[in-house]
Protein backbone atom coordinates (compact mmCIF):
# COMPACT_ATOMS: atom_id res chain seq x y z
CA UNK A 1 0.00 0.00 0.00
CA UNK A 2 1.27 3.41 -0.95
CA UNK A 3 0.60 6.55 0.95
CA UNK A 4 1.15 9.96 -0.48
CA UNK A 5 1.82 12.96 1.61
CA UNK A 6 -0.54 15.69 0.59
CA UNK A 7 1.16 18.87 -0.42
CA UNK A 8 0.60 21.59 2.12
CA UNK A 9 -1.98 24.03 0.92
CA UNK A 10 -1.07 27.67 1.27
CA UNK A 11 -2.43 29.16 4.45
CA UNK A 12 -5.23 31.63 4.14
CA UNK A 13 -4.08 35.19 3.98
CA UNK A 14 -4.03 36.52 7.51
CA UNK A 15 -5.96 39.65 8.37
CA UNK A 16 -3.60 42.42 7.34
CA UNK A 17 -5.75 45.22 8.70
CA UNK A 18 -5.46 47.41 5.64
CA UNK A 19 -1.69 47.49 5.16
CA UNK A 20 -0.89 49.60 2.12
CA UNK A 21 2.24 49.67 -0.06
CA UNK A 22 2.88 52.66 -2.31
CA UNK A 23 5.49 52.01 -5.00
CA UNK A 24 6.69 55.17 -6.77
CA UNK A 25 8.57 55.35 -10.07
CA UNK A 26 9.63 58.93 -9.41
CA UNK A 27 11.25 59.26 -12.84
CA UNK A 28 7.91 58.50 -14.49
CA UNK A 29 6.26 61.16 -12.35
CA UNK A 30 8.73 63.94 -13.18
CA UNK A 31 9.26 62.84 -16.79
CA UNK A 32 12.93 61.87 -16.50
CA UNK A 33 15.80 61.70 -14.05
CA UNK A 34 15.26 63.62 -10.81
CA UNK A 35 18.04 66.21 -11.04
CA UNK A 36 16.97 68.57 -8.25
CA UNK A 37 15.50 68.22 -4.79
CA UNK A 38 12.72 70.58 -5.92
CA UNK A 39 11.60 67.98 -8.47
CA UNK A 40 11.46 65.33 -5.75
CA UNK A 41 9.55 67.67 -3.41
CA UNK A 42 7.07 68.45 -6.20
CA UNK A 43 6.59 64.75 -6.93
CA UNK A 44 6.09 64.01 -3.23
CA UNK A 45 3.50 66.74 -2.75
CA UNK A 46 1.58 65.79 -5.90
CA UNK A 47 1.54 62.09 -5.03
CA UNK A 48 0.57 62.85 -1.44
CA UNK A 49 -2.59 64.52 -2.76
CA UNK A 50 -3.45 62.22 -5.68
CA UNK A 51 -2.74 58.93 -3.87
CA UNK A 52 -4.19 60.21 -0.55
CA UNK A 53 -1.08 59.42 1.49
CA UNK A 54 -1.74 59.66 5.22
CA UNK A 55 1.63 58.56 6.62
CA UNK A 56 0.53 55.05 7.59
CA UNK A 57 1.55 53.40 4.32
CA UNK A 58 4.89 51.86 3.45
CA UNK A 59 6.39 53.91 0.58
CA UNK A 60 9.14 52.70 -1.77
CA UNK A 61 10.64 55.15 -4.29
CA UNK A 62 12.60 53.86 -7.27
CA UNK A 63 15.21 55.89 -9.13
CA UNK A 64 18.42 55.59 -11.09
CA UNK A 65 21.78 56.50 -9.61
CA UNK A 66 21.49 59.89 -11.30
CA UNK A 67 18.51 60.92 -9.16
CA UNK A 68 19.32 59.03 -5.97
CA UNK A 69 20.63 61.97 -3.95
CA UNK A 70 18.00 64.45 -5.14
CA UNK A 71 15.19 61.94 -4.58
CA UNK A 72 16.44 61.01 -1.13
CA UNK A 73 16.87 64.62 0.00
CA UNK A 74 13.64 65.87 -1.59
CA UNK A 75 11.42 63.10 -0.26
CA UNK A 76 12.64 61.98 3.15
CA UNK A 77 11.24 58.89 4.81
CA UNK A 78 10.47 56.36 2.08
CA UNK A 79 12.66 53.40 1.29
CA UNK A 80 14.78 54.29 -1.74
CA UNK A 81 15.66 51.58 -4.27
CA UNK A 82 18.28 52.42 -6.88
CA UNK A 83 19.42 50.72 -10.05
CA UNK A 84 21.42 52.05 -12.97
CA UNK A 85 20.96 51.38 -16.66
CA UNK A 86 18.01 51.23 -18.99
CA UNK A 87 14.79 50.90 -16.98
CA UNK A 88 16.90 50.83 -13.82
CA UNK A 89 14.30 52.40 -11.52
CA UNK A 90 11.57 50.18 -12.99
CA UNK A 91 13.63 47.02 -12.48
CA UNK A 92 14.48 47.98 -8.89
CA UNK A 93 10.77 48.44 -8.15
CA UNK A 94 9.86 45.21 -9.94
CA UNK A 95 12.24 43.38 -7.61
CA UNK A 96 10.23 44.75 -4.68
CA UNK A 97 6.88 43.76 -6.22
CA UNK A 98 7.98 40.27 -7.28
CA UNK A 99 10.60 39.15 -4.76
CA UNK A 100 9.37 40.55 -1.43
CA UNK A 101 6.13 38.57 -0.87
CA UNK A 102 4.02 41.70 -1.26
CA UNK A 103 0.82 39.64 -1.67
CA UNK A 104 1.37 38.13 1.79
CA UNK A 105 2.18 41.40 3.52
CA UNK A 106 -0.17 44.00 2.06
CA UNK A 107 -3.89 44.29 1.32
CA UNK A 108 -3.44 47.16 -1.11
CA UNK A 109 -0.73 48.26 -3.53
CA UNK A 110 -0.64 51.67 -5.17
CA UNK A 111 1.76 51.85 -8.12
CA UNK A 112 2.68 55.38 -9.13
CA UNK A 113 3.85 54.87 -12.71
CA UNK A 114 2.39 54.46 -16.15
CA UNK A 115 5.04 52.10 -17.49
CA UNK A 116 3.81 48.88 -19.09
CA UNK A 117 6.78 46.97 -17.69
CA UNK A 118 4.77 46.65 -14.43
CA UNK A 119 1.64 45.11 -16.04
CA UNK A 120 2.49 41.45 -15.39
CA UNK A 121 3.48 42.00 -11.76
CA UNK A 122 0.38 44.10 -11.12
CA UNK A 123 -1.87 41.46 -12.70
CA UNK A 124 -0.26 38.76 -10.53
CA UNK A 125 -0.86 40.80 -7.37
CA UNK A 126 -4.49 41.31 -8.36
CA UNK A 127 -4.91 37.59 -8.98
CA UNK A 128 -3.46 36.93 -5.50
CA UNK A 129 -6.20 39.08 -3.95
CA UNK A 130 -4.34 42.36 -3.53
CA UNK A 131 -6.34 45.49 -4.37
CA UNK A 132 -4.17 47.35 -6.92
CA UNK A 133 -4.46 51.00 -7.94
CA UNK A 134 -2.29 52.62 -10.60
CA UNK A 135 -1.65 56.36 -10.34
CA UNK A 136 -0.10 57.85 -13.47
CA UNK A 137 0.39 61.17 -15.22
CA UNK A 138 -2.45 61.81 -17.69
CA UNK A 139 -1.58 60.48 -21.13
CA UNK A 140 1.38 58.44 -19.82
CA UNK A 141 -0.22 55.18 -18.67
CA UNK A 142 0.14 52.04 -20.78
CA UNK A 143 -3.04 50.26 -21.81
CA UNK A 144 -1.74 46.93 -20.49
CA UNK A 145 -1.10 48.47 -17.09
CA UNK A 146 -4.56 50.07 -16.94
CA UNK A 147 -6.14 46.70 -17.74
CA UNK A 148 -4.05 44.89 -15.09
CA UNK A 149 -5.07 47.22 -12.24
CA UNK A 150 -8.36 47.27 -10.36
CA UNK A 151 -8.43 51.07 -10.57
CA UNK A 152 -6.50 53.79 -12.39
CA UNK A 153 -6.14 57.41 -11.31
CA UNK A 154 -4.51 59.99 -13.56
CA UNK A 155 -3.19 63.40 -12.63
CA UNK A 156 -1.98 66.47 -14.46
CA UNK A 157 1.84 66.35 -14.66
CA UNK A 158 1.83 70.11 -13.98
CA UNK A 159 0.88 69.26 -10.38
CA UNK A 160 4.44 68.04 -9.95
CA UNK A 161 5.89 71.31 -11.26
CA UNK A 162 3.82 73.34 -8.83
CA UNK A 163 4.34 71.12 -5.81
CA UNK A 164 0.87 69.63 -5.70
CA UNK A 165 -1.06 72.90 -5.89
CA UNK A 166 -4.34 72.44 -7.71
Question: What does each of the following model-derived ranges do?
Answer:
Residues 65-166:
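Nuclease catalytic cores that cleave nucleic-acid phosphodiester bonds
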Residues 1-92, 131:
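Domain-level signal for Mg2+-assisted phosphodiester chemistry and nucleotide/NA-binding surfaces
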Amino acid sequence: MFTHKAAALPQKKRALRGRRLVVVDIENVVGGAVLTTEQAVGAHLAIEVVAALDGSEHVVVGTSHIGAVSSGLGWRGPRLVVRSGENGADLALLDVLIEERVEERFDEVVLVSGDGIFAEAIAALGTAGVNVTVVAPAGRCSRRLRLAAHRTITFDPLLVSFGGAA
